[in-house]
Amino acid sequence: MTAPPRIAFLASPAEPAVAARARLTQRYGDHALDSADIVCALGGDGFMLQTLHRHGAADKPVFGMKLGSVGFLMNQYRDNEDDLLERLQRAEPAYLRPLEMQVQTESGASAGSLAYNEVSLLRQTRQAAHLSVDLNGQTRIAELIGDGVMVATPAGSTAYNYSAHGPILPLGSHTLALTPIAPYRPRRWRGAILKADTEVRFRVLDPYKRPVSVTADSHEIRDVVEVTIRESTQRQVTLLFDPEHNLEERIFSEQFAV
């Protein structure tokens, strides 16, 4: 008989998530992350992203259950906790590769971060950002004027990217969305769909008069002068979903939401 998986339960600080964790650990035990087979994250999408950033390198599959305001990356939490092992056994995997971001700032400092949803550049003041856009070393837009621009993964394409009128990308399509944010010029440019291995470089054309910040998921860096983004070839995380609500179907269904 196969032993049940060892589960590490992680919860957001929200009271419903903390209470759910207490009930689940009483039922299934409380395993440390380094000895667990599966991570169960209790919260919303924000907590799921936090979990991936903090523990993605542990290479443990993550099964999220929604106890927050947004749960696109989560499964539904059910009051009947007795079926969790069956759900884990039936769960379907989704494999996500984050974006790697490298940044140069006005002060000459360098910084880096990962993003599972998107990397977005935004103006810091009332003045529009002026940016150049290079793809694989070739300048494609010499001057983009607007509030900013972003690069989104398929998993993140239904979030901020979609709100900015960017395309929804199928999971496993090996593509990225390049989406302007409130563009003024070029007026007719609405972004592009890129191959996942494309290197994207943004340069801030007037960083002193028109300062720009960059955010990788929730990690913000201000006063940037150059940002380079590429899909990670080293890091991959596995999310687990109930078969009837798998991530691929959710992304597909979003294209028909009214």
Swiss-Prot record:
GO cellular component: cytoplasm
Gene Ontology process terms (BP): NAD metabolic process; NADP biosynthetic process
Gene3D superfamilies: Probable inorganic polyphosphate/atp-NAD kinase, domain 1, Probable inorganic polyphosphate/atp-NAD kinase, domain 2
GO MF terms, alphabetically ordered: ATP binding; metal ion binding; NAD binding; NAD+ kinase activity
Sequence similarity: Belongs to the NAD kinase family.
Role description: Involved in the regulation of the intracellular balance of NAD and NADP, and is a key enzyme in the biosynthesis of NADP. Catalyzes specifically the phosphorylation on 2'-hydroxyl of the adenosine moiety of NAD to yield NADP.
Parts forming coiled coils: none
Superkingdom per UniProt: Bacteria
InterPro entries: ATP-NAD_kinase_N (IPR017438), ATP-NAD_kinase_PpnK-typ_C (IPR017437), NAD/diacylglycerol_kinase_sf (IPR016064), NADK (IPR002504)
PANTHER family the UniProt entry points to: NAD KINASE
E.C. numbers: 2.7.1.23
Catalytic activities: NAD(+) + ATP = ADP + NADP(+) + H(+)
Protein name, entry field: NAD kinase
Primary location group: cytoplasm
Cofactor(s), names only, from the UniProt record: a divalent metal cation
Residues at the catalytic site: 45
SUPFAM superfamilies documented for this protein: NAD kinase/diacylglycerol kinase-like
